[in-house]
C-alpha cells in the first residue's frame, strides 16, 4: 500500500499507429495522478525547495502556469499541506482552472500571456512572501524527467534502440531531461522539438500567437538545452486538434493539443 498518490507517478509506453518497418510509441502521461507529465516536475521542484530550506511548513507557493504545471503543483501542495496560488493567462482553458481549484488552489486569472502571469507571480512573491518555484529556470524541472521519464523509457523499450524523441516545448523540462537520459544511452538519438506555428521562437518564425494549451510560451526557457536538439518542427493549431481525435477513437488514449502536435511532427 502506498502512503499517498505521489507514489503513483509514472506512465506506460504504448505502441501507436506506425509506418511500415517502424515502431512509434507514446508515453501516456495522463496516467500520472494529476493527469499529465507536469506532475513529475511539480513534485521534484517542491521537494528540492524543501531540501534547500527554501520551502517550509506554513509557506505559500505561487507559480505562473498555462495549466498542467499548476494542476501538478496544486495536487502536490494538497498532499503536502501547502497553500498554492496559481496565476494563469485568461486565454487558457477554464477546465484547467477548475481542476486547480478542485485541489484547493487559489487561481488568479490575468489578461495577456504567460509573461503577464509571470509578472503577477513575481509581485505576489515580493509582496506576500510566497515561494515561487520558477518552472522555466528551476533545474529540478528537467532533472525530474532525467530521473523518471527517461529512466522509464529505457526500461520500457527493453533491447530496442531509440532513434528519435519528439516532444513539445514549453518550459523545456520534458525534452531536456528525457533527451539527456536517452542521449547517454543512444548517442545518435535524434531529438525533435515541436512548437506552435504561431509561437515559433526556435524556428525563427511567427511569435504573435498564444492559442496552444501547454506549449509555446513565446520565449526560449532557460531550462531548454538547445544543444540537444536536432530539429524544431512547427504545427498549426487546427491540424494538431484534428490529430487528437484518431488516437482516442481508434486506439484508446485521449490526447490534447500538444500530443496531437507531436504526433504530426
Q: Where are these predicted regions, by residue range?
A:
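PLP-dependent amino-acid enzyme catalytic core
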Residues: 1-265
